[in-house]
Amino acid sequence: MKGDLGTFTADLSRWQAKLPGQADLLVQGFSQTVFNEVQSGGKYSPGTPIASGFARANWDGGVGAIPSNPPTITAEAAEANPAAGRAAAAEAGRRTATAILTAKAGDRIYLSNTARYIRRLEFGWSTQAPGGFIRLALNSAQAIADEVGAFLVKRGLRGAQ
């Protein structure tokens, strides 16, 4: 697909064995953590660089199909009012979280961004993330899966009661 910045999988099977009946929760937690790393940053990625908030506001998530929601703010509006751009980015995060909560084990989950310059940001256009942010999160997928699985086990989520 044109513009595809990566496809990845992580092995969740060992955690599924430790979390019987909780495979959906494991997939949801993993997917949300990857999204958070890409959009806002965290342990593995600095997140999408933010000036006006437009690039962060353009993230969208979907389950089973590439999402096609239109951006909630234009580049011009975000540049004129960065606070509105950041608010739109927060809304994009909430919209994606809502989509991820519908995911089931085995579903394909998509993250997309329609900002014209997202690829340039990923490949060093911004001094905020010169080493990228998408690839850093994707390259850490297994570590993220292991952290989410360990967190759920620690919380005592051993299966449906």
Feature annotation, model-predicted:
Residues 124:
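Globin-like tetrapyrrole-binding proteins
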Residues 10, 14-121:
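Short, low-complexity, charged/polar segments at coil/turn and helix-coil boundaries
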Residues 1-14, 161:
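Short, intrinsically disordered N-terminal pre-domain segments
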Residues 127-161:
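Protruding loop/beta-arch "assembly-hinge" segments enriched in small, turn-prone residues
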